[in-house]
Every structure is written in C-alpha cells, then in structure tokens.
Curated annotation (Swiss-Prot):
Domain of life (superkingdom): Bacteria
Protein name per the record: Protease HtpX homolog
Gene: htpX
GO terms for cellular component: plasma membrane
Binding site for Zn(2+): 147, 151, 224
Cofactor note: Binds 1 zinc ion per subunit.
Length: 292
C-alpha cells in the first residue's frame, strides 16, 4: 500500500505541474479568448479518475481475471510430485525474496511460459503453463519461477499499473485540450462542441495512445531485465541463462492474453518493431545476465 500511496502522490504532483505549466504557457488564456469555457481543474480531475480508475480496477481484479482468462487451476493440495515440487520451490523463493507465499497455479498451454500477477507483494499469483513443465528441466523451471517471484518482490504489477494510469491520464487530458484548441481556434465553433472537437480528440487520443504504449513497453522491458537479475540471485545465473536458451530453442507464439503477457517469461515477437515489445529480445537478456 505504501508503494501505491507514494506513486499516486507523485503522479498527482505531475498532473498539478502539468496544469501549472499549461497556465504559464498561456494555453488557458488562449482558450478563454476563443470562448471555450474550458475548466482545466475539472478536466484534470476527470482525466485522472478515468485514467487511474481503470488501471487500478484492472490491477485489483488481476488475479481473478488471469485465472479465468487462462483457465489456471490453483494448487490447493499437490496431487503429484511435480505439483509438490512446484509449490515448495515457490515457497522457498518467496521466503528468500521477502514476500508472502503466492498462490501457485498451472494452466493448459503448449508454449513455455509463466506469469505473475496480483494487487500486492503478499497476495499474488504465480502460474506456469503445462508446456513449461513438460519441456523444461527442473533447473530451468526453477529459474523461471524465480523470475516470476522477482516480479512480485519488485512490485512490478503495481508499478506498471500506475505508469499505465499516468499515461492514460495524460492521453485523455491532452487529447481534449487539443480538441478544444482545434475546434475553437481553427473551426471557430462558438458554442458547445462541434464535430471538429470530437474528431480531433479521437485522432489525438489514438496518436497519443500509441506514444503512451511505447512508454509503457519501455518500462516493461526494463522490469524484465530486473526480474532476470532477481532470478539469477534466487536460483543462480547459469540456471536463468539456461532457461532463456531453452526459450530460444522452443519458441512458440505466446498464448497468454495481452493483459498479462507483460509478466510472462516469454515475450511475443513484434512485427512492428522493438518499441512495442513488452520483453527485450532473448539474446539481449542473456547478454545482460552474462555481463552482470
């Protein structure tokens, strides 16, 4: 909760600074001169409620939605040696990382993957695919589990959710500002909002949304490097390198839903470019581990 509180305070401070900056630049005076009647403070609050609200609700529901989207089955009582090893390995790593014991689950999928999700460090979920258990050795699987436990220990779910909330707020706020400016200054709408406002706001939101995605994906890639380093500490660098090598050899397109793909061990290859990848290329991750 401390992490959430600090991030919210920081992000609200950023929004206040944005409002002050726009006022110092005279944007509010320009809009007033054009008769827009735009209330900066009300727009900021509305943008923050929508931007942060959606992100935090998604975070709060992350465990429930992840289980339902993947069909993951939580291991309540291990029914075989593999499940017993899985639970005990996560328990040992969670204790070493200083986090509460997460729920451990298995979901049916042929690809080698795993993910972690949850609202906080002491109420999380670690899930692995059936394909991972079938195709990886115990050492490799141990490294993958350590990677996911490191995501939990680093608070990555909360961090990315709040970053997403910030960029959502900026996108909503700035797209409406742009819509007002174009509608009043260019199309000379005198009262209310003309068609230009809605069209311009929509286009601006799409363009800014793309830029926002690039920012969020950059943060996601940095968190992957940190989780790899955390795995190296918990399970050993050689095991983590071996796990990444196995991913290179056995690569299959990820079957994880987009909402939780950022926390899978195996990222999806992007045809558009690296800017939109949630995970760094596997070779770069291996090089980072070997040079550490």
């Amino acid at each position: 909760m401390k992490r959430i509180f600090l991030f919210i305070v920081t992000n609200l401070a950023i929004l206040v600074m944005l409002s002050i900056t726009l006022r110092l630049l005279g944007v509010d005076r320009i809009l007033d001169a054009e008769g827009s009647g735009l209330n900066f403070n009300a727009l900021l609050v509305l943008s923050a409620v929508i931007g942060f609200g959606g992100s935090l609700i998604s975070l709060a529901m992350s465990k429930w939605s992840a289980k339902h989207m993947t069909g993951a089955t939580v291991i309540e009582i291990p029914s075989n040696s593999t499940e017993g090893w899985l639970v005990e390995t996560v328990r040992r790593q969670a204790k070493a990382a200083g986090v509460g014991m997460p729920e451990v689950a298995i979901y049916d999928s042929p690809d080698i993957n795993a993910f972690a999700t949850g609202m906080n460090r002491n109420n999380a979920l670690v899930a692995v695919s059936s394909g991972l258990l079938q195709k990886m050795s115990r050492d490799e699987a141990e490294a993958v589990l350590a990677h996911e436990v490191s995501h939990i220990a680093n608070g990555d779910m909360v961090t990315l959710a709040l970053i997403q909330g910030v960029v959502n707020t900026f996108v909503i706020f700035l797209s409406r500002i742009i819509g007002h400016v174009i509608d009043r200054a260019v199309f000379r709408t005198e009262e209310g909002h003309g068609p230009a406002y809605f069209v311009t706001s929509l286009v601006a939101q799409l363009v800014l949304g793309i830029l926002a995605t690039i920012i969020v994906m950059w943060f996601s890639r940095q968190r992957e490097f940190r989780a790899d380093a955390g795995s190296a500490q918990l399970s050993g660098r050689n095991k983590m390198v071996a796990a990444l090598r196995r991913l290179q050899q056995e690569y299959e397109p990820s079957h994880l839903p987009d909402k939780i793909a950022a926390f899978g061990i195996s990222g999806q290859k992007s045809q558009i470019g690296r800017l939109f990848m949630s995970h760094p290329p596997l070779e770069e991750r291996i090089q980072a581990l070997q040079s550490a």
